[in-house]
Structures are given as C-alpha cells and as structure tokens.
Amino acid sequence: MQKRKDFIWKMGGQQGEGIESCGEIMATILAKEGYSLYSQRLFASRIKGGHTTFALRVALEQVMSIGEGVDFLLSLDQETVDMHGSEVREGGYIICDSKVNPDFSKFEGTKVNCLSLPISETAMKQGSMLMRNIVALGMSVALLGFDTKMFKDAIAAKFAKKSQEIVDKNLAAFDDGYGLVMEKLGDVEIDTLPAPGKKDQMFLLGNEACALGAIAAGSRFMASYPITPASEVMEYMIKNMDKLGATIVQTEDEIAACMTAMGGVYAGVRGFTCTSGPGLSLMAESLSMASMAELPMVVIDVQRSGPSTGMATKVEQSDIDAACYNAHGDYAGIVISPTSIEECFYEIQKAFNLAEMYQCPVIFMPDLQQGLNKQSVPTFDLNRVPINRGKMMKEADLPELEQPKYFKRFELTEDGISPRTIPGMKNGLFLSTGLEHNEEGKPAEAPTMHVAQTDKRFRKLETVADNYEPFLNNAKYDEADVLVVGMASSRGAIEEAVAEFDQEGVKVNHLQLRLIKPFPAKQLQPFFDAAKKVVIVEHNATGQLTNLFKINMHKKSKISSCLKYDGNPFTKSYVKNAIKEVL
C-alpha cells in the first residue's frame, strides 16, 4: 500500500450524538501510539442539538493546525454531507447513515467515494442508538487501516465500570461497523499511515495546558467565574485542588473573581483568574486598581468572537484593544500571548514571573482555537521555567522601622521596581489602596508625587522585552520579500504557507508575536526593515494588531492586514492568498 504523511478525519451530526466521544476515543489511542495529532471541535452555543463536527488531523510529524480538506468524512445526517462534503479531497470517502437516505448527487462524476451504510440500524441491533458512535468508530478504523486490537481494548476499558453485557455490546457494535466497511471495500486499497513508534507526548487542551502551567508556576489560588471558552482552566484546577492543596473560588461574577484573585496576590500567593472577552470588560476597573496598587496578578483571557455575547464557541482575536487599553487612566500592565498549545504551559509560567518581577497585572491571551482544541505535544518539562518572584523581601532582611513609619512599598527606585513585602511581615507594614500614594502607600495628591509615581509605574516596564522573548523567530532571510506576523493560533497556518513559499523561491520571513504590551518595537524593527512588505495576520475585523504596528513602527506604508472574522481558523491557503496580494 502507498504511504502517506497525514490524513484528516471528520465526523459530523447533531450535538449530543456522541460525536466528540467517538473522536476522543480515536485521538487518545492514536496519541498513545505516537501519532502527532491536532483536533478541532466546532459546535453551537447550546447544550444539545445543533450541528457539530469533530475533526482530527493525524500525522507522522508534529502539526500545528487542523489543515485543509478532509480525507474521511463520517456523517450521521444529511446536513453534514451538505456542509462538509465539498471539503473531501479526490480519492476521499464519505460515509453517511443510510437511515437519512443520503443525497450524494453532487458527487456524481467526481473522485469522491460515497457510501450509504446502516449506522443507526447496526446500533439498534445491539439495543441502543447510543452506540452509533461506536459503530462509526469501527467504520473509521476500517477505513483508516488501523489494527483493531488497541481500539477494542480501549472500548473495554472505557465501559469496564459498567456491566460485562454493556462491554460486550459495545465491542459487538465496533465489530459490526468495522465489518460493514471491510465488506463494502472488498479488495480496494486505501492509503494508510505507517506506525511512527511510541513517543513521550501528551494530548491535551490549551486550557488544560494553561492550568498545568499555573500549577507548575506555584499558583495554588484561583478565583474565577465560568465562561466559554475558558471554563476548562477552572475545571482542571478544581479536579486537582485536593492533591495540590489549592484553593479555588467560584465567585458570583467576574468583578468578584478579579478582586478575589487580587486579594490572594496581596496576601502573597500567586493568584490568578480566567475569563473571556465579556468578563475582561467587567474586570477593567479592578485591573486599573491592580496597576495602581502594583499587584502582580495574572488574568487568562481566552479570546472568543464578539462583541457582547457574540459567538461564544467561535475563534477570534478581538480582545487586543481591550487588553491593552480597557482599564481606565494611565494603566501600566503587560499583555502576552502563547503561540501554541505547548506554549500555553510554558508562557503562563513566564506570565507569573513577569507579574512579580514587574509588580503589575499580566493578561495572558490564548484564543479559542488554542483553548478548546487538543494537540499532541512533547511531555512538559516541569523544570524548564524557574520561578522568579522578583524583589520579594524576606522578613529577616527588613530594617527596623520606627513607628509610625511604614515600609516604602512604593519606593521611587531607579528601575521603577520597589522592594515588596506581604502582610504579616515584621517591619514590612504599608498601605495599599486604589488612591495615588506616596512611597509608603499613604494617599497623596501632590502634583510632583503623582508625576513621580506615574513615571515609576511605566519606567519599570521599559525592560520587559529584554527579559522576555517577545516573539517566535522563524525569519531565515536577511532580506525578505514579505514579513508575516501573527499571534496565538494562526502560527500553524502561517508556517505551512511560508514552507510552500520557500519551495517556490519566495522569501517570506515569519514572526509569531508573544509580547503585545509593552509593544516590542525596538526588537521588531530590524525584521521590519529587512522586508519589502509586512502582512499582519489576525482574527478580527478592525486590524487591532495591525494598528499597534502602525502606532509603534516606522515605514507604515509597507503594512497590510490579513483579516479573518467568520469564526473559523486560518488555513494555509487563506494566508498564502493574502501574501500573494502584496508580492
């Protein structure tokens, strides 16, 4: 048989029909076998009903996006055929439940193979329509040419806590589905994916990686309010709070969540909260207070489509302006974004370090595509990012204070960063409010002190880009035709587009931005100057990231945008077409 490097499998139907669980079983098994995976769920903002799909890209080498096209489409309804049939590549397969009497007429004369098979009827032979997804799993395994044993072992383990009868019926449903496809295919050969050999890897959500990263950073306190697409961070923390000795507070709203997390930070712990766009709006006043009080808190903002409730289950990168400017006054804070699901783990640890090193709020901004989808990544190194608590004082090192003097918590230092104490430290007493203050934290409205403290709060941020890698550098050309810059989940599609341009002899450099605020203009300028054109790739309608470039960079005329705001992730072709327009 011919060997391939990857394939894309997709299953669709109505929410609540077991589509996600079918995909999860397949993905979990293949991840254990060493395949590199990227999964994507598309679903409506409702509990049950409405069209949904689960797509899985399976590859021999690491993939950073869901890719384009579909090789194997498994459909439980006609809607899936109508909506996604055009994605199926030549030589690909569509299997649809014969119960819906599928219409394949638009595929006549094409090289797409269409099979109408009795998925529901086969499930009912085992006594329940709930087994349709297991029948579909068996069909998929037959199409993909995988060994059945590992899947059957997984099914047996999944239902082991139930009766042996349930286990046997699910195994029979799997065998029936497998047999139907094998009988239909006969001697037809399908390209298969060779076994890569087992790897030391994990398969997890970006949100789970964020939670794991927070734990690795030493955080044991979280206050949050559930919101799509960020809730999984809190759910993971709650699931593991007992073994961690952690405290998780589900508050009544996002304002309370932010203030509660600030309270934990004030008390000396590494506290954080997690939200999405609507919640970030509610946190604006609290974040401004955290900036004034120089409290090192972390806010995870998993970006979704807006404005308002928007499309809560669709991807967008439209919180950039809100993260940078939402808090009132001259707000001093840091905004960073991970470039991959793997970086959700490592960069969130750096977010906690930055917060304490610079004593300010840090907003950590993955997007929905990262937060709610899974990718296989090398097993995390818990020791890669050492904990840095900045100028945290030890009680033994504090000089004696003569009452009623307070500790100079907001001392006007050369680098703008003051020594920090926490409540309870002898000789470390200070005031902390949202009011402008003097060095001891006492309210002060003298013009000179306000200017001095404001300058101090911004002066300390001048070295952020020197102490943090502001972007992922994929720029290999000293002189480039185009520089492409993206953020968050766009990385995979951009890298695939750039790789094709390399093969075509077009010089395209690529940077994936991590540091959004303070904007790393100095570090970006050499790459900017070395390119004839600059294309900013972002998921919003107004070019929010592009505007940051135009505000901060020279030679603005060379900048253009590649915008996408339909709720779907970037693809290689979409990015490539945008680059071609400026060549």
Report the location of each language-model feature.
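Flexible, glycine/charged-enriched surface loops at secondary-structure junctions
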Residues: Q40, M150-F151, S163-L171, K184-L193, ...
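Gly-rich Lys/Arg/Thr-decorated short loops/hinges at beta-loop-alpha junctions or inter-strand turns
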Residues: D6, F159, E183-K199, A214-S219, ...
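Flexible, low-complexity linker and terminal segments
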Residues: F203-C210, I215, F352-L583
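A short, gly/pro- and small-residue-rich
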Residues: M83-N101, S291-E294, L545-L563
